[in-house]
């Protein structure tokens, strides 16, 4: 026996008529193995899995005289020792010193590797096995089949003729994502084993679509699979879809287990009336595990060639990303156009945090001309802000910021250069009182010399005494709101120093009643929760105070339970008013989930309004509009959400919103929405996604302005699920104003587990169609350039 070779156990089969291996039997998994989420695909090719071998007969090493006694039963071997080799067959001949020949369902096992064939020849001296006829090499979930193979077992070096193969690995998911088993299969002329987890294939195919005749696959002159680095390399390759080549690569690298990998991302192709034919071919650099970059050249048929790039980074203490776009010359406008964006967040010390958010474009029409997304094209202001925040404890914090905007449409807001804030809320005060405080210093500046500038200093200490008992609560609160203005550019001719001090008193109280009830043959816990909220703020003339950042709150349930009508610090409304409201809820007693909620409320005024913004009419009536809202899940598959604002003085509806959704299962959703605001808008919105049969799905949305008698937004799309691939198309038309309409076409082919081609409408559909489901989720992560 050669020195240094592992021990060998040879076991002739005790039963001549050994059963065949069952076809299609899945490999056994450890009971401790994590559950995996399989990717949708066509039926997988059946691969044989050998059953457990019969009891082994242990033979002593060559030269050992011990022999079993005549007629004695052969000894059964226990588990195979690490590094030991076991051979089983119906017939074994030869000697260990030269070579052993095993015939008839022959198997060789060592350290989790199985080599089986009709005939096996094994040389212990060279550790080389030659296999012929129905050859199978298996290790874990990996399988390779073919007619002939030569393999050095320990080194895992050799060749396999005309193999069919399937390799599977579990992904290493990000927190919150499921574990997925990512499999690839194909066939080749020759497979070269080049060490553990290293394979090189000639004239090979590769597909993550598991089927005997996959709809798509990679075809390569040379294919390398390196499962140590989890990287595949294609040379002279193409992607075949439905027997038609759609890609060709002289060389490409791709991840095997869905990890990030440098290389070209899938190209995006689209069409819009603003940009024309729109093609982008991004290149992705995986620079390190915690930072990467993308270079994205973009060709627009009507505009020209745009260069773009993005850089991202992430560490335990900070994270951020930067993005640039540059169009040297717009063929339509003849001008240079550009975009820049920087976002950064950092934990400087355990209590000190910093952030930076800078955004800029070359001109006001940049997004409207160069974006096909309504949410982007309708942007009004671009934020430019730097912020430091200090959290000293669980009851107080401070922050400092500088802030300005690039205004694309409308009036420029004031810049805050700087703004300092101090907030506190301490619960453990004497006699159960709660201390609150808000302090602010802000310097306002404006680019328009016709507008006033100056600083505002605010102190607002508050003291409250909550009484909370089962079934009710009462919380009185008193505070003094003090404001000091120092005006640098006072255009009114009044004093450049203004002081305002106002006491503010509120009383918040509520009751909570509960009872068991039955609705639609189901038991619920029903609540009745009346609430009364009183505010008293004396009048102070504030007409000489400029308006830097103040606007009236939108009227709604949040506003009627607030102490001030205005957002911002330039107006403190006089108030002697009470708000009364009642809420009733249906709660599932088993889960605690809220099934339905109904609320109605109204504010009552004891005095007329005297404080107002410039040009704002003052309220004279004693009753505010009535508010009502209802939301809930009517059935397990349908829900309603509605809100109503009613003017009792004129007996008119001021605003009304209504939305109903029917969603019986994934990728089935129908939505109806109606929005009304008197003299402002009246919109009807319909959207949905629904299977049409045969793997086809329809998705659409239409929004019509009943007030203007025109359609403001339309989406129409079709999707087809081919099992291991999906094709999507969508047309999007929207109008930011009646004279400016944008139209865009999205077409995408997604090969599950490989790549996508075209421009994806998925984000658009998720934003626009409530309940939209991506029909091929969950899928294996894209591997060609996915990140």
Swiss-Prot record:
Ranges of Low complexity compositional bias? 59-78
An annotated GO cellular component: cell outer membrane
One BP annotation, GO? Gram-negative-bacterium-type cell outer membrane assembly
- Which InterPro entries does the record cross-reference, listed alphabetically? LipoPS_assembly_LptD, LptD, LptD_2, LptD_C
Q: For the region Disordered, give the residue spans.
A: 1-78
Q: What biological function has been recorded for the protein in this entry?
A: Together with LptE, is involved in the assembly of lipopolysaccharide (LPS) at the surface of the outer membrane.
Partners and quaternary state?
Answer: Component of the lipopolysaccharide transport and assembly complex. Interacts with LptE and LptA.
Checking HAMAP family in the record gives:
LPS_assembly_LptD (MF_01411)
Family of this protein: Belongs to the LptD family.
Q: What is this protein called?
A: LPS-assembly protein LptD
Q: Provide the species name.
A: Aromatoleum aromaticum (strain DSM 19018 / LMG 30748 / EbN1)
């Amino acid at each position: 026996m050669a020195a240094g070779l592992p021990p060998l156990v040879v076991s002739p089969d005790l039963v001549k008529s050994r059963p065949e291996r069952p076809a299609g039997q899945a490999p056994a998994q450890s009971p401790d193995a994590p559950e995996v989420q399989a990717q949708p695909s066509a039926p997988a090719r059946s691969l044989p899995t050998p059953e457990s071998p019969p009891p082994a007969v242990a033979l002593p090493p060559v030269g050992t005289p011990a022999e079993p006694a005549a007629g004695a039963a052969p000894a059964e071997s226990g588990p195979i020792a690490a590094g030991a080799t076991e051979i089983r067959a119906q017939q074994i001949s030869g000697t260990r010193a030269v070579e052993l020949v095993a015939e008839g369902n022959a198997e060789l096992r060592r350290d989790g590797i199985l080599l089986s064939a009709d005939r096996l020849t094994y040389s212990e001296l060279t550790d080389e096995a030659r296999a012929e006829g129905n050859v199978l090499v298996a290790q874990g979930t990996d399988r390779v089949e073919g007619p002939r193979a030569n393999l050095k077992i320990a080194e895992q070096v050799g060749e396999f003729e005309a193999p069919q193969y399937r390799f599977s690995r579990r992904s290493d998911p990000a927190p919150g994502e499921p574990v997925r088993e990512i499999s690839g299969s194909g066939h080749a002329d020759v497979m070269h084993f080049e060490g553990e987890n290293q394979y090189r294939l000639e004239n090979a195919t590769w597909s993550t679509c598991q089927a005997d005749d996959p709809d798509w696959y990679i075809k390569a002159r040379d294919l390398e699979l390196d499962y140590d680095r989890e990287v595949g390399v294609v040379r002279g390759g193409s992607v075949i879809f439905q027997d038609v080549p759609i890609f060709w690569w002289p060389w490409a690298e791709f991840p095997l287990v869905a990890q990030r990998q440098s290389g070209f991302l899938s190209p995006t192709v689209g069409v819009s009336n603003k940009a024309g034919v729109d093609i982008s071919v991004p290149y992705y650099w995986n620079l390190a595990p915690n930072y990467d970059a993308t270079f994205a050249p973009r060709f627009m048929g009507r505009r020209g060639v745009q260069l773009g790039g993005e850089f991202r980074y992430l560490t335990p203490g900070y994270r951020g990303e930067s993005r640039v776009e540059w169009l040297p010359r717009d063929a339509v406008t003849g001008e240079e156009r550009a975009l820049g964006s920087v976002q950064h967040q950092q934990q400087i010390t355990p209590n000190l945090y910093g952030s930076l958010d800078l955004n800029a474009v070359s001109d006001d029409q940049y997004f409207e001309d160069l974006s096909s997304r309504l949410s982007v094209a309708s942007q009004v202001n671009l934020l430019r802000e730097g912020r430091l925040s200090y959290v000293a404890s669980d009851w107080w914090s401070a922050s400092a910021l500088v802030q300005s905007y690039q205004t694309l449409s409308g009036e420029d807001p004031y810049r805050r250069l700087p703004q300092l804030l101090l907030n506190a809320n301490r619960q453990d005060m004497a006699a159960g009182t709660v201390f609150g405080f808000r302090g602010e210093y802000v310097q306002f500046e404006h680019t328009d010399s016709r507008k006033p500038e100056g600083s505002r200093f605010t102190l607002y200490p508050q003291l409250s005494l909550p009484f909370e008992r089962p079934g009710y609560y009462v919380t009185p609160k008193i505070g003094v709101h003090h404001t000091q203005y120092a005006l640098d550019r006072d255009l009114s001719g009044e004093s450049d120093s203004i002081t305002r001090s106002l006491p503010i008193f509120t009383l918040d109280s509520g009751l909570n009643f509960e009872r068991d009830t039955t609705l639609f043959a189901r038991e619920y816990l029903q609540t009745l929760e009346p609430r009364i909220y009183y505010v008293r703020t004396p009048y102070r003339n504030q007409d000489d105070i400029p308006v830097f950042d103040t606007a009236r709150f939108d009227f709604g349930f949040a506003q009627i339970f607030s102490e001030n009508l205005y957002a911002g610090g330039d107006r403190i409304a006089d108030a002697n008013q009470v708000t009364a409201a009642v809420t009733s809820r249906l709660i599932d007693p088993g889960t605690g989930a809220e099934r339905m909620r109904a609320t109605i409320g109204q504010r009552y005024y004891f005095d007329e309004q005297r404080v107002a913004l410039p040009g704002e009419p003052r309220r004279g009536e004693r009753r505010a509009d009535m508010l009502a809202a209802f939301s809930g899940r009517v059935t397990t598959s349908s829900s309603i959400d509605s809100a109503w604002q009613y003017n009792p003085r004129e007996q008119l509806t001021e605003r009304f919103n209504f939305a109903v959704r029917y969603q019986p299962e994934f990728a089935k959703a129908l939505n109806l929405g109606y929005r009304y605001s008197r003299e402002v808008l009246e919109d009807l919105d319909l959207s949905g996604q629904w299977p049409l049969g045969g793997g086809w799905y329809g998705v659409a949305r239409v929004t019509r302005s009943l007030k203007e008698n025109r359609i403001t937004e339309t989406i129409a799309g079709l999707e087809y699920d081919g099992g291991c691939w999906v094709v999507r198309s969508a047309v999007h038309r929207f109008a930011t104003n009646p004279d400016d309409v944008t139209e865009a076409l999205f077409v995408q082919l997604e090969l599950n587990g490989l790549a996508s081609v075209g421009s994806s409408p998925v984000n658009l559909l998720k934003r626009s169609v409530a309940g939209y489901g991506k029909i091929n989720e969950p899928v294996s992560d894209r591997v060609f350039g996915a990140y």
